Amino acid sequence: MLALRSGLRTALAPRVLTPQVCSPFATGPRQSNGTFYEFRTYFLKPSKTNEFLENFKNSVHLRTAHSEMIGYWTVEFGGRTNRVFHIWKYDNFAHRTAVRKALAKDKEWQERFLIPNLAFIDKQEVEITYLVPWCKIGTPPKEGVYELATFQMKPGGPALWGNAFKRAVNAHVELGYSTLVGVFHTEYGALNRVHVLWWNESADSRAAGRHWSHEDPRVVAAVRESVSYLESQQNTFLIPTSFSPLK
């Protein structure tokens, strides 16, 4: 009987809830907002890259009639070449589904571009990303070049490394040598991956700015903290196409 009473007291006693760790990268607010960005990478046949780009340039209005294109670039260096990289904005997943269905029924898009050019593509990669809550899409001051810095962070999620990563990015922003376009956290694709898109006036101005930043104690301290959570990093140098909204 005493054992039974003790068990009942334990079962009925108020539970003490363990505080949850919050992070500025938490997916909740982004998913409630719904807006996400689709990263598409096409690996093209070397002999067909220029033809593919010219054909898309002539048909881009057919595609953008269905959803917003943020930017369209070719990869100059930083991995495999003969690649194109583009970003598309969607209000939510229902919006994307509706767009894909509409494109499948758009005969002009299918006949003028998609069907004739599919054979030019060796491989496609697609990621679904959200802008981090502390970042909005930036507007570059003029035409230039772009760098996509991709960080593969340690497992544990933004609750583990989000604050340190934010401080590292902002330390570079505050120096003013480069314009931050966006910070994107992958939802579908490799997890614990963050993409940071930067604008620079030129490759040489970027190199000079990076050299300067490495001598700034604020940047050095912030990066030293963030890098403890980093598994790998890859930088890709991007050239905007003539039809890219982001130039």
UniProtKB/Swiss-Prot annotation:
Signal peptide: none annotated. Keywords: Cytoplasm. One of its GO terms (cellular component) is cytosol. The modification N6-succinyllysine is found at residues 45, 48, 57, 166. The keyword Transport does not apply. It is found in: Cytoplasm, Cytosol. One of its GO terms (biological process) is mitophagy. The keyword Membrane does not apply. InterPro entries: Dimeric_a/b-barrel (IPR011008), NIPSNAP (IPR012577), NipSnap_domain (IPR051557). Gene3D superfamilies: 3.30.70.100. Belongs to the NipSnap family. This is Protein NipSnap homolog 3B.
